[in-house]
Regions:
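A secondary-structure micro-motif
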Residues: 4, 11-181
Length: 181
């Protein structure tokens, strides 16, 4: 029965490993000579690794972008700094919903504030997180901090120029009626 337990243990361990791996896919950032204008990165994981369009890409805990193209061995992720990047966010600790957009530069911008919020920005440290709206990303992924000098400016937590390894996260929204952007 000891052998049986060992076998059970092994099975459980491989199941646990499988579930951990299927949740997060570690990818290496490849040098991308394709376009200096499009702020995107190429990753060494593709459909063979279960990468799908729309998945979140994180650097440690920080959101850096989302997968926009997938082939068998590689994928491309659009960075938060790209002009085409728009993600629903929440500003904490004030709880304001907004949209974070890329500027094509090193920082992001806050758009579509649900209410006038100039008067609320008395707090020094306002952190921008994904809100989870639209089911695109799971809520609570840290994006950046609101700049001291300009309340619509986001300083991203991650330095996109320094990315070497990232994790691709699959997040399935519980519910059928969500749309991908």
């Amino acid at each position: 029965s000891n052998e049986y337990l060992k076998l059970e243990n092994k099975k459980l361990r491989s199941l646990i490993n499988e579930s951990i791996e299927s949740d997060k896919i570690l990818a290496k950032v490849l040098i991308d000579k394709e376009s200096p204008f499009l702020r995107s990165i190429v990753l060494n994981k593709g459909s063979k690794d279960k990468v799908k369009i729309g998945m979140a890409v994180v650097d440690q805990a920080y959101l850096v972008g989302k997968v926009i193209e997938v082939n068998y061995t590689n994928s491309r992720a659009l960075l938060l700094s790209d002009l085409n990047s728009k993600i629903p966010v929440v500003l904490e600790p004030i709880g304001l919903q907004a949209v974070a957009t890329g500027t094509g530069k090193e920082y992001g911008e806050i758009e579509y504030i649900k209410e006038k919020y100039e008067n609320k920005i008395k707090i020094k440290d306002i952190v921008v997180y994904t809100s989870g709206l639209g089911g695109l990303f799971k809520p609570g992924l840290p994006v950046g901090k609101i700049a001291r000098d300009k309340i619509t400016k986001i300083n991203f937590f991650s330095d996109f120029k320094q990315l070497e390894y990232v994790k691709i996260i699959s997040y399935s929204f519980k519910g059928n009626n969500w749309c991908r952007h």
